[in-house]
């Protein structure tokens, strides 16, 4: 790992998949005009986001909440634009049923759509059951 990578990751000891989601959301915020919490040092938004996470200057639960909202909005728009009727082929019942209370529904005039979301506490806790299989 070179000095640039170690500078970004030195303060973060969580799951790398969670890091990607959090950094993506924060980079999106920075691209939308949010103020940086660390010196930019000529870095791109993704690197700045990683350095902010590593420095523990962000409220990760807030960043996670914004990522979930963005995901829900995207799924609602996607389902509406596709006119998906009555079934959810993207989420298997066995996967969503093992995450108690994590299924969310999207309702329109025609039908109900389901999607499974990882809840904030499990996401931030770094627990073994983080919804990512095979890694």
Swiss-Prot record:
Keywords per UniProt: DNA-directed RNA polymerase, Nucleotidyltransferase, Transcription, Transferase
- Extract the Pfam families matched here: RNA_pol_Rpb6 (PF01192)
| Entry EC no(s) | 2.7.7.6
- GO BP annotations, alphabetical order: DNA-templated transcription
Question: Which molecular-function annotation in GO is an example for this chain?
Answer: DNA-directed RNA polymerase activity
> What reaction gets catalysed by this protein?
RNA(n) + a ribonucleoside 5'-triphosphate = RNA(n+1) + diphosphate
The keyword Transcription belongs to this UniProt entry's keyword annotation: yes
InterPro entries, alphabetized: DNA-dir_RNA_pol_omega, Pol_omega/Rpo6/RPB6, RPB6/omega-like_sf
Where, if anywhere, are coiled coils annotated? none
Q: Name one GO cellular component term.
A: DNA-directed RNA polymerase complex
Q: Where is this region: Disordered?
A: 84-106
Q: Which NCBIfam families match?
A: rpoZ
The family line of this record is: Belongs to the RNA polymerase subunit omega family.
**Function according to Swiss-Prot or TrEMBL:** Promotes RNA polymerase assembly. Latches the N- and C-terminal regions of the beta' subunit thereby facilitating its interaction with the beta and alpha subunits.
Task: Describe, as the record does, how this protein assembles with itself and its partners.
Answer: The RNAP catalytic core consists of 2 alpha, 1 beta, 1 beta' and 1 omega subunit. When a sigma factor is associated with the core the holoenzyme is formed, which can initiate transcription.
HAMAP family per the UniProt record, alphabetical = RNApol_bact_RpoZ
Supply the name of the protein: DNA-directed RNA polymerase subunit omega
Originating gene: rpoZ
